[in-house]
Swiss-Prot record:
Organism listed in the record: Oryza sativa subsp. japonica (Rice)
Protein name, as recorded: Probable serine acetyltransferase 1
Family: Belongs to the transferase hexapeptide repeat family.
Keyword set, alphabetical order: Acyltransferase, Amino-acid biosynthesis, Transferase
Xref: SUPFAM superfamilies: Trimeric LpxA-like enzymes
A GO molecular function held by the record: serine O-acetyltransferase activity
GO biological process terms held by the UniProt record: cysteine biosynthetic process from serine
InterPro entries: Hexapep, Hexapep_transf_CS, LbH_SAT, Ser_AcTrfase_N, Ser_AcTrfase_N_sf, Ser_O-AcTrfase, Serine_acetyltransferase, Trimer_LpxA-like_sf
Any one Pfam family match given in the protein's UniProt record, by short name: SATase_N
Highest rank taxon of the organism: Eukaryota
């Protein structure tokens, strides 16, 4: 989807519809490569929060505490995550300090936050604003928490990293091992039931639907989980097992079981999955979110 493209094609005007609070057009935005991009996204989030607080007084206190009282996107995210993941024995103040320190020390984490927000806003027609994703998208929140846990894992603070993993699984129903490496511009759409194993690697601009498993094949140790290339789309309920490689721009059909490598720009569909050819001119499915062209366009030949 390109910037400025309508989220929905709705040529027939709907009668008796209340006026929309959110525009149905994704605003033009720069690529998330600089502090200016982070500032722009943060300004959009604050504007949306002010608008929503005015429109819905019941949410005003929540929006002020979570967004409007904070000086930056990373502070707002840290506060929100800390309050989502805290428990009676894992205090929100401890988690807030942990998230703030991690985001401050690792600019790549902040860049990934912005890229993930842009990904959700541009790829998901149900995403009505950046603030909606920041506050309500559990897939987005689970990824940000996992990135902090990944930093802790690399620092050999593994007990705390695993405690974060456990809380994310309990709160969001998303189970991502702290050692898994996740790129930027990643969308976990719906996210419920997503499981990503210890040695999994996920590239940039990947989209993953709910109930997806990137798992091992049994009790083997070592490098045993899938490697997902850039721009891959993994449909709902798909399972990919073992140290297999899913090439850049590949597509995994909903409900498929993948046990073999999938070449770049190729679709895998079925249980067990078979490979269908791709076309060099196709959009990257992880960005276009085209779930069905493997049936409509590529079913005329197979590899």
């Amino acid at each position: 989807m390109t910037a400025g493209q309508p989220l929905r094609d709705d040529p027939q005007p709907r009668r008796h519809s209340p006026p929309a609070l959110h525009p149905a057009v994704v605003p033009a935005y720069p690529p998330p490569e600089s502090d200016a991009d982070e500032s722009w996204v943060w300004s959009q989030i604050k504007a949306e929060a002010r608008r929503d607080a005015d429109a819905e007084p019941a949410l005003a206190s929540f929006l002020y505490a979570t967004v409007l009282s904070h000086p930056s996107l990373d502070r707002s995210l840290a506060f929100h995550l800390a309050n989502k993941l805290c428990s009676s024995t894992l205090l929100s103040t401890l988690l807030y300090d942990l998230f703030v320190a991690s985001l401050a020390a690792h600019p790549t984490l902040r860049a990934a936050v912005v890229a993930d927000l842009l990904a959700a806003r541009s790829r998901d027609p149900a995403c009505v604003g950046f603030s909606h994703c920041l506050l309500n998208y559990k897939g987005f929140l689970a990824i940000q928490a996992q990135r902090v846990a990944h930093v802790l894992w690399a620092q050999d603070r593994r007990a705390l990293a695993l405690a974060l993993q456990s809380r994310v699984a309990e709160v969001f129903a998303v189970d991502i091992h702290p050692a898994a490496a996740i790129g930027k511009g990643v969308l976990l759409d719906h996210a419920t039931g997503v499981v990503i194993g210890e040695t999994a690697v996920i590239g940039d601009n990947v989209s993953i639907l709910h109930h997806v498993t990137l798992g091992g094949t049994g009790k083997a140790v070592g490098d045993r989980h899938p490697k997902i290339g850039d721009g891959v789309l993994i449909g709902a309920g798909a399972t990919i097992l073992g140290n297999v490689r899913i090439g850049a721009g590949a597509k995994i059909g909903a409900g498929s079981l993948v046990l073999i490598d999938v070449p770049p720009r190729t679709t895998a569909v079925g249980n067990p999955a078979r490979l269908l050819g791709g076309k060099k001119g196709d959009d990257m499915p992880g960005e276009s979110m085209d779930h069905t062209s493997f049936i409509q366009q590529w079913s005329d030949y197979s590899i």
